[in-house]
Amino acid sequence: MPLLDSFTVDHTRMNAPAVRVAKTMQTPKGDTITVFDLRFCRPNMDILSERGIHTLEHLYAGFMRNHLNSERVEIIDISPMGCRTGFYMSLIGTPSEQDVAAGWTAAMEDVLNVESQDQIPELNEYQCGTYSMHSLEEAKDIAKTILAEGINVNKNDELALPESMLKELDVK
């Protein structure tokens, strides 16, 4: 099985909260697609609560679009990581890590301004696969933590696992 890009970086050295350009690729028409690793907490040290990350998934996607989408950037998708330490954001365009961090900060402030659970978008059995698994309070706790700690930048060249280690770790 091919080694995915996200597994070529050393998760023990990742800072969080932090933005990282996980991948860039060109479409046949010449558009650039950028995938960002939006790391909310340190891998293997902390984990986002189930209800909190689910509520953030519903809120964060819209708020990030409000702050990042422009004539040069269009968010395709924002999805939680299976390890529950952050989100992946795929978009058309090449915003800087600082622009993404500023949008993320503004989105966390927006989360804190949501007044009640009934303001969570698509919170119903028709549009959500587990609509009873939400907590606005837990989402706000996550947002408060991000705002208190500030958002840094993780660089791939600083996190790259050496080839020798990748070979050693190779699953047979």
UniProtKB/Swiss-Prot annotation:
Entry-linked InterPro entries: LuxS_sf, Metalloenz_LuxS/M16, S-ribosylhomocysteinase
Pfam families linked to this entry: LuxS
Cofactor binding notes: Binds 1 Fe cation per subunit.
Binding-site list for Fe cation: 54, 58, 128
Superkingdom to which the source organism belongs: Bacteria
An individual GO BP term: quorum sensing
Keywords, comma-separated and alphabetical: Autoinducer synthesis, Iron, Lyase, Metal-binding, Quorum sensing
EC annotation from Swiss-Prot or TrEMBL: 4.4.1.21
UniProt xrefs under HAMAP family: LuxS
Subunit structure: Homodimer.
NCBIfam families linked to this entry: PRK02260.1-2 (NF002602)
Function field: Involved in the synthesis of autoinducer 2 (AI-2) which is secreted by bacteria and is used to communicate both the cell density and the metabolic potential of the environment. The regulation of gene expression in response to changes in cell density is called quorum sensing. Catalyzes the transformation of S-ribosylhomocysteine (RHC) to homocysteine (HC) and 4,5-dihydroxy-2,3-pentadione (DPD).
Family statement drawn from the similarity comment of this UniProt entry: Belongs to the LuxS family.
Name listed for the protein in its UniProt record: S-ribosylhomocysteine lyase
Organism of origin: Photobacterium profundum (strain SS9)
Organism ancestry: Bacteria, Pseudomonadati, Pseudomonadota, Gammaproteobacteria, Vibrionales
Name of encoding gene: luxS
